[in-house]
Swiss-Prot record:
<dbReference type="Pfam" id="PF00155">
    <property type="entry name" value="Aminotran_1_2"/>
</dbReference>
<keyword id="KW-0028">Amino-acid biosynthesis</keyword>
<comment type="similarity">
    <text>Belongs to the class-II pyridoxal-phosphate-dependent aminotransferase family. Histidinol-phosphate aminotransferase subfamily.</text>
</comment>
<dbReference type="InterPro" id="IPR015421">
    <property type="entry name" value="PyrdxlP-dep_Trfase_major"/>
</dbReference>
<dbReference type="GO" id="GO:0000105">
    <property type="term" value="P:L-histidine biosynthetic process"/>
</dbReference>
<keyword id="KW-0808">Transferase</keyword>
<dbReference type="GO" id="GO:0030170">
    <property type="term" value="F:pyridoxal phosphate binding"/>
</dbReference>
<dbReference type="InterPro" id="IPR004839">
    <property type="entry name" value="Aminotransferase_I/II_large"/>
</dbReference>
<keyword id="KW-0368">Histidine biosynthesis</keyword>
<comment type="pathway">
    <text>Amino-acid biosynthesis; L-histidine biosynthesis; L-histidine from 5-phospho-alpha-D-ribose 1-diphosphate: step 7/9.</text>
</comment>
<keyword id="KW-0032">Aminotransferase</keyword>
<protein>
    <recommendedName>
        <fullName>Histidinol-phosphate aminotransferase 2</fullName>
        <ecNumber>2.6.1.9</ecNumber>
    </recommendedName>
</protein>
<comment type="subunit">
    <text>Homodimer.</text>
</comment>
<dbReference type="InterPro" id="IPR015424">
    <property type="entry name" value="PyrdxlP-dep_Trfase"/>
</dbReference>
<dbReference type="GO" id="GO:0004400">
    <property type="term" value="F:histidinol-phosphate transaminase activity"/>
</dbReference>
<keyword id="KW-0663">Pyridoxal phosphate</keyword>
<dbReference type="InterPro" id="IPR005861">
    <property type="entry name" value="HisP_aminotrans"/>
</dbReference>
Length: 356
């Protein structure tokens, strides 16, 4: 009898699936989601739009109206093209697949977004992690040395970084781009609505840079839409490994509709930026808590015992992310999403119990 062990790659057999906990009944502050629903009139209008979507037809592979709207709203340079993905996760997988030549490597600062390493492993690429400094800032000298030593195919720079919230200095990013002449530098701006800084306007100035974004953190995590901006010479190659019809018709219609009303989402992002400042101050005042600077919609917090804090919050029905085992630099760290005022109040009340 044939078994999975006879067929599946050994490295895949040794892996575990990406864990997504059941959040039913919890204050959900573990996944950097926008806590705000659409205003009722806008939600009703969206429902009316979606009711007329042709569900019996395959989606357009390059929906012109949606791409034009993305260009207009985000200021995509005229010389750049746009490639859509089923979330940025799919785009990361496509990049790895397209670049998976024998001996090719992927390089990124660590701790960082886990999908950079996972996608490299799935494509059988070597992943090179360059540790941040102890204060979780970028070690530019180590990055430049690693670029010279490994000459990776792909270099990921999360701007800002997840899970640390670090926003790397522009001059360091420029030095990395210049040093990565043999690489493609992918600047991941998933949290741009909260960082208020971007490399997208400069995407056409470099022949080895693409900028990746997602609609998820802006408030549309449920529709799964990511997009890659870069020179056509790059995007035409990545498009070859894109699954046909990868972005469904409901996602396309919802994204186009909401980009026409992006001021609502932008206002929500502004609320969360203000709440981030207040929440960081309040958590930082608790005994034993150290809050790291963040340019995302989340805070990284070091506590005396991350596992104990996580367990107390679970008891209080507040779900956060215990990242303390992800990397040695994250010892006793938890990551909390900035939520609504009510959610933040619940979080603070639970943290006061965990950090008396």
């Amino acid at each position: 009898m044939t078994t999975p062990e006879d067929i599946i790659r050994r490295d895949v057999l040794a892996m575990t699936g990406y864990p997504v906990p059941d959040a039913t009944g919890f204050v959900k502050l573990d996944a950097m989601e926008n806590p705000y629903s659409l205003p009722a009139p806008l939600a009703a209008e969206l429902g009316e739009r979606l009711a007329h979507v042709a569900l019996n037809r395959y989606p357009a592979p390059r929906p012109a109206a949606l791409i034009d709207r993305l260009r207009a709203v985000t200021g995509v340079p005229a010389a750049c093209d746009v490639l859509l993905g089923n979330g940025s996760d799919e785009l990361i997988s496509m990049l790895a697949m397209a670049c998976a030549k024998p001996g090719a490597k992927v390089l990124a600062p660590v701790p960082g977004f886990v999908m950079y390493e996972l996608s490299a492993k799935f494509a059988q690429l070597e992943f090179v992690g360059v540790p941040l400094r102890a204060d979780l800032t970028l070690d530019i000298d180590a990055m430049l040395a690693a670029l010279a030593e490994h000459r990776p195919a792909l270099v990921y720079l999360a701007y800002p970084n997840n899970p640390t919230g670090t926003l790397y200095p522009d001059e360091d990013v420029e030095r990395i781009i210049a040093a990565a002449a043999a690489s493609l530098v992918v600047i991941d701006e998933a949290y741009q609505p909260f960082a208020q800084r971007s490399w997208l306007p400069r995407a056409a100035q470099f022949d080895n840079v693409v900028v990746m974004r997602t609609m998820s953190k802006l408030g549309l995590a449920g529709i799964r839409l990511g997009y890659l901006v870069g020179l056509p010479a790059w995007l035409v190659q990545f498009d070859k490994v894109r699954p046909p019809y990868n972005v469904n018709v409901l996602t396309q219609a919802a994204a186009e509709f909401l980009l026409e009303r992006v001021d609502v989402l932008d206002a929500q992002a502004a609320q969360l930026r203000d709440a981030r400042t207040a929440l960081a101050h309040a958590i930082g005042a608790l005994p034993g808590a150290t809050v790291f600077p963040s340019a995302g919609n989340f805070l990284l917090v070091r506590v005396p015992d991350a596992a104990a804090v996580f367990d107390v919050l679970l008891t209080e029905r507040v779900l956060i992310k215990n990242v303390s085992k992800m990397h040695p630099l994250l010892a006793n760290c938890v990551r909390v999403t900035v939520g609504s005022p009510e959610e933040n109040a619940r979080l603070l009340a639970a943290l006061k119990l965990a950090l008396p």
